């Protein structure tokens, strides 16, 4: 296993999976070339990829960061009545949080020619596909937190529709859009667009 190739594959997988889950878009084509059917460029794939490029990837993910022990002030009367469980022995010594944090050494992101890990070309900054909603650098930070804010911005036309469609699919066996991972031009059209919009907003 070539460590850099492994890392690049996992970052690409996170990018593709996030795109399908949150936006209902199949962007994997844009890893090697501009998307053939949807208006997503090769550069836009790697701009989205750059949000995940600074996550530490060690191959073996250790247990999370230990959470600090809470410090609370509780009156004696509280412990005798409503909070009697406070006097019970702790069931866990430590609580771990599974948090993926940014790498300490930030790496630059490059467009990879034909998606190959060993063929970097031009540098790109974190951005999202313009066709969905342009990434406003004054409104969002250029990390995964900023990306999450972008996903849940009320102006984003896809996140809520994709989520509602998946919930509908769980209840009724088929989504309002029958291709839940593809809201792009090759996916199915919603059988009731007004219902999808109404449920999403």
Whereabouts are the PLM-identified features?
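Sequence context surrounding c-type heme c attachment/ligation sites in exported
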Residues: 1-78
